[in-house]
Amino acid sequence: MNYKTSIRNFDNKDWVWPERDIVAWRYLTREDHYNLPINVSNLVKNRNIVVQAGGHCGLYPNKYASLFKKVYTFEPHPENFYCLDQNIQQDNVVKNNLALGEKESMISLGEPLTKKKNNTGGYTVSGKGNIKLISLDSLDIEGCDLLHLDLEGFEWFALKGAVNLINKYRPLIVLETNDYCEMHGYTVVEMEQWIVSELKYKIIDKWEHDTVYAPE
């Protein structure tokens, strides 16, 4: 499929980007957001494998590729994944055009949560469709030192689908935490109570909309 894209320059690199997007570009290229992978990585003892989702157009996977030996990135939206695939050519990045959740299904992605047509960064699971959703536990991932999820309110379902991975490798976990989750029937408080009681993790840091959890 042909997508309308443009070339934008940031951090001494040309990026293939959705032509209509303004909001996500401004947000992700803001210094504090673009440097989030660096800040997170400083808390990780062993930088071998990071599992990151959603990958959007590749800014975070690109940064993580320079910080970890191997990166697994997930981006379900076709247009965003096309851009990610063009932007990320490093051999240590495994790119997956998949959504993450609790169990395998076929889903659709709704309009960006901001309701703005010039934002490609806010799509969320909105029902049945033709996009494949899988659980992390269904994959043969050989390790995980950091699990970073930014799924527009779908983070808890992805965590439930990664319990075996988390229990086996005990990675540092970073989640976007905001009220988007309420569209999917839960609150941040409920999710964090589950993280503490079931996964045996604790909150160790927070940056704006992102919360960091470490094993007890």
Show the residue positions of the predicted features.
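Hydrophobic packing residues within well-ordered alpha-helices of enzyme cores
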Residues: 64, 84, 109, 158-162
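Soluble or luminal CAZymes and related metallo-dependent hydrolases
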Residues: 32, 76, 128-132, 154, ...
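Short, glycine/acidic-enriched loop or turn micro-motifs at the edges of active sites
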Residues: 55-57, 78, 100-102, 151-155, ...
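Glycine-rich adenosyl-binding loop in Rossmann-like folds that engage adenosine-containing cofactors
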Residues: 5-38, 96-142
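Mobile, glycine- and charge-enriched loop segments
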Residues: 44-51, 109-123, 148, 152-155
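Short, charged, surface-exposed secondary-structure boundary motifs
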Residues: 80-83, 105-107, 182-186
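S-adenosyl-L-methionine
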Residues: 1-87, 91, 141, 188-191, ...
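Conserved acidic-Pro-Pro-aromatic motif
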Residues: 48, 67-73, 138-216
